[in-house]
Amino acid sequence: MEKQILCFIILITCISCGLGLDSGLQNKQLKEPTYSPNYAWQLKLDGRRIGSQPYTEGQYFYLIEYLVGTRTVQLVKIDMETGVYVWKADQISDGEEWRSSNVVKADNKLYFMRPNSGLIYCYAENDGKLLARIQVGATEAEAIRNRCSLETIVTDGTALYWGSKGEPGTAPISGHLLKLDINTIDYTKHSTVQICVPHSLYTKGTRYECTFWSAPIIDGDTLYFNTYNRDHPNGYCSLVSIDLQSETVKWEKQLHGLQGRVNNDLIIKDNILYMLDVTALLRVDKHTGEVLTRYDDEKDPPYTQPLMIPTVSLCGIWYDGGRLYYTTVGSTETASQTGMSKDLVYSLVCIDAKTLKFLWGFHPVSGTSSTYPVVKDGKAYIVTHIDGLRVFDAKTGKLLGVDKSIIAWGDEANVLYKDYFIFFNTNFKTNRATLCAIRV
């Protein structure tokens, strides 16, 4: 099935679902078992999580908050043992409240990028002091071209890596997989913006061949990424492996029929690279790039297979015990919009990681989500958009319980820390979020 149109339609549907919290939807829902969370702590945030994912290391949680009612953001450090702020960095007011890259850590420093300006901010991990602001281009225009695509950067501890947006238009500029060595940064000049120009590890001749819509990942000394090529004249995207020591391409595969447009579509487990696209699911040998297993979505009706296509804005994929868990494009409107049977529509699925075959799924009650479930001791926990906190038997998919007092935007990444499932609970009226930890 060609779902590039479907993804857009369902995205609009999900937004409209979110606006109808009091529309009587609950009266249409079947009676479901209830779940009563055992809270370890709850922290009311100063604002809400911004459009970027948090970073965790040890017992600490690093988050960029959007301060409600302002155009201001701040980086914060939270103790996951106690649920209290450790520090709050100085606020940033640069005219863009929503978008930041994810937070990464190298040595004892934290980094994130503001894509609106092409600036990287660096902070001390121990106290949150600003150490540097770096413009990733010789000019502001070049920095904008070099900014990260889809707000994602990664690090191997010595450098920062990201896929750039390039530039559309009558004379389009191709995107690049960029590298910025952090030893080129002067950490004593925090009061002024310094210029550090990254260099390219990978590009193509035209923007149609090299645009980035998915997050790269690092495994050891190797970086993996795929390009976005929906408009590629030959209809394929490229899956690439780069050796970070030699900065050379280890292998590159042309994947015909794939678009490479899912935000966080890659995960590596046991030497296998999994790629989830809007048209196909792949299982790949990470050393050679050989496609070991491929599942292609149905292109035309009548549809007979379960809906297993991931949502475009996927936060990530959870792996547990030879299974992959993730959210799809499915919502309550999917059946009427596509002609699919409601029995085939799922907003959360569990598939066999070796065969890529469907094992179980959750039929959506209202809006879908782009987050992922966390699996602990045979149970899968997920905070959905409007459908509440839901707990499933991770093996069978049986719904064990629901707490509908917990709601979220559905696009937040969850965290498993020891025996704590940590998630965001949002008050839609105030747009304030509470970071919660429950014992699981």
Identify the residue ranges that each predicted region occupies.
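Repeated scaffold domains used in trafficking and secretory/extracellular systems
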Residues: 47-58, 95-105, 140-155, 199-218, ...
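Short glycine/acidic-enriched loop and turn motifs that connect beta-strands
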Residues: 67-71, 116-119, 166-171, 229-234, ...
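A short loop-to-beta-strand structural motif that recurs across blades of beta-propeller domains
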Residues: 73-76, 119-121, 175-178, 237-240, ...
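Short loop/turn segments that connect beta-strands within beta-propeller blades
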Residues: 79-82, 124-127, 181-185, 243-247, ...
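Loop/turn-rich, solvent-exposed surfaces of beta-rich toroidal or solenoidal domains
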Residues: 326-349, 357, 361-391
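Blade-level signature of beta-propeller repeat domains, shared across WD40, Kelch, NHL, RCC1
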Residues: 399, 403-440
